[in-house]
């Protein structure tokens, strides 16, 4: 078991450094040692998502979810993988499942809101961003995204207030200054 953890954590570290090939090799080693453990599948799925191997990422998230179906982030990551493959229906289903799994996780609402925003469903997007902010008042990405909704729906003063909030929360966010 210690070797499995060592391979897994080394893989996660390599993935964070952008060394995806070596990370994936370490995940293979960990999974070969203990294919019954769900964690390496999730972490390898994240690495594959970051490395734009979306179909393979979905396969890993499927394996993880079969063993651990109460982790909202797994559904969010699988939803993002589907979104990158332009399968908005499955992305939406996964974001909904993530929200049902953990109603206090702002990321599920933010991701679903982002999908609504992309589809110009502004009322639904705004409701999701509001809910994400209700879950975590410091979740700056939802303020930023809600400001985009306000801009798209001709509410510039509300957009400015949200962009100001993003700057207050993270003064290094250059996208806020650009928008």
What residue spans do the PLM features occupy?
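Alpha-helical tetratricopeptide repeat
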Residues: 1-179
């Amino acid at each position: 078991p210690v070797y499995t953890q060592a391979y897994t954590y080394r893989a996660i570290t390599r993935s964070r450094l952008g060394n995806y090939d070596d990370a994936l090799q370490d995940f293979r080693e960990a999974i070969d040692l203990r294919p019954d453990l769900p964690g390496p599948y999730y972490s390898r799925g994240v690495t594959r998502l970051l490395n734009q191997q979306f179909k393979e990422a979905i396969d890993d998230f499927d394996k993880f979810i079969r063993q651990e179906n109460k982790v909202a982030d797994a559904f969010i990551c699988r939803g993002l993988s589907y979104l990158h493959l332009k399968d908005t229906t499955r992305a939406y289903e996964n974001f909904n499942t993530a929200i049902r799994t953990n109603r206090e996780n702002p990321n599920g609402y933010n991701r679903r809101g982002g999908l609504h925003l992309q589809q110009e469903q502004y009322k639904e997007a705004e409701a999701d961003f509001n809910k994400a902010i209700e879950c975590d008042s410091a979740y700056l990405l939802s303020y930023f995204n809600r400001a985009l909704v306000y801009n798209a729906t001709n509410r510039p003063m509300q957009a400015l207030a949200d962009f100001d909030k993003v700057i207050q929360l993270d003064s290094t966010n250059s996208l806020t200054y650009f928008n």
